[in-house]
Amino acid sequence: MRVLRYTACTTRHTCLNTVIFNWSLCMTVIPVTEQRNPASYQIDTKSTEEILTIINNEDKKVPYAVEGAIPELTKLIDRLVPLLKKGGRLFYIGAGTSGRLGILDASECPPTYGVSADTVQGFIAGGDDALRRSIEGAEDDENHGVEQLKSAAFSSSDMLIGITASGSAPYVLGAMKYARSLGSPVGAISCNERSKTFELADFPIFLPVGPEIITGSTRMKSGTAQKLVLNMITTTAMIKLGKVYNNFMIDLMPVNAKLEERSKRLINEITDCGQSRAAEVFGESGKKIRTAIVMASLGVDKTEAEKLLKAGGGNINFAIDAHAKHAD
């Protein structure tokens, strides 16, 4: 394969034609995530504002790439939700940026939706040390991911999603093969249409963001697209699990002053009970927003609110309806 070289010059048109020609020779053998982006040729000669504009223009393509994956994401989530309802878990596995994004999404589910830390878990090649610094070669260990899944007692009741921009990391592929051997549902998120992970996935999520503006720097568009998709997966799943009322997160964990104030404001907005009453039921409920909403809505105490919620399967509307039927 021909090595590509160029030097900055005033005859930009001539240089650009040469580079495009050479680039086209490589397209059939290099994954799209490793290809050069024509929009950023000679980016090292640009002004600061020009560089930022190039980056921004490329980033605008990301939401459209994600939009195309919605049908397959729908299938994945519709399989995931019943699994979670039965006590199953969601696991992410990835190397580098992909692994960090999976762990980030998993770590934000407990405080946002009140689920246990076991419900959504993330693993990264190289372990926790790789969260803060790059551990070279970790993604080449095909057995490491398998060992991590075994340590978490991963089973056929759980779902695994492999996250990898290029789709070729042995660490991810090994874990996906193991999950499939157990009969677990397996998803894959990749920005390369010929991703090896897609061959192992029940739910292939292809994100065609194209080449990065810095060749091979998949922490950029690829990482952004992956983050958007992970947001969509867990947010939609939690909505379907009843963790959201209207567009409020009613199971958030008020672990600091900011979140306590948000919780009181949320109770007041939903019930229109007044801020002082919202603060009162928030405290009486043991800082459980869902319980406080029923207390404020129906004028019942914590014990009765919890009984109604249990009868309604945790659904606030069902709890209120059950109270109304009982009153009749």
What do the PLM-derived regions correspond to, one by one?
Residues 68-83:
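A short, well-structured juxtamembrane/interface segment
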Residues 56-62, 122-133, 272, 286:
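Gly-rich Lys/Arg/Thr-decorated short loops/hinges at beta-loop-alpha junctions or inter-strand turns
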Residues 232, 237-328:
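Short, amphipathic alpha-helical interaction segments embedded in low-complexity terminal/linker regions
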Residues 91, 95-229, 234-241:
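Glycine-rich phosphate-binding loops that contact phosphosugars or nucleotide phosphates
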Residues 27-65:
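Cofactor-/ligand-binding subdomain signature composed of acidic, glycine-rich
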